[in-house]
């Protein structure tokens, strides 16, 4: 078990070489973010199974955009509001919210999984519900570019069309 603040591109291979899988945990803000990116890059380049939850999934998207798609300045608007590549962005309905108390997307939400995906394999069904607690989402304006580069959007909310799962 490694705290992401202790990981970087220089030590990730040595520290993670014996891992059978990597979990990138949820969180908020900048703390440990570069270590999460280092772990994700190592996992992707070495075919180590990886699960990113909430901010962890967002970091997967950012790392992929930077290192596979060549969008070196890709980021979340939570970390860098002026990033030229807003691959993770504040939900549209959140952009004018000034009172943050109780403003997050909370509770269980429907998600439809694509058959043949690893997520479908794990759940054994197409319709699932998962709980949420966040305000930032995968920016669907980039969906086609991500899928063309090999990151597939395999879980989607049927009402909002928000991407919930990527592989």
Identify the residue ranges that each predicted region occupies.
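Cysteine-nucleophile active-site neighborhood
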Residues: 15, 21-110, 116-118
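Flexible loop/turn segments at secondary-structure boundaries
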Residues: 6-9, 30-32, 58-61, 137-139, ...
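C-terminal and late-domain segments of enzyme folds
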Residues: 15, 106-167
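A short linear-motif detector with a strong N-terminal bias
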Residues: 2, 88-92, 132, 145-147
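Short, flexible loop/turn elements at secondary-structure junctions
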Residues: 3-5, 28, 115, 142
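A short, well-structured beta->alpha microelement
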Residues: 1-13
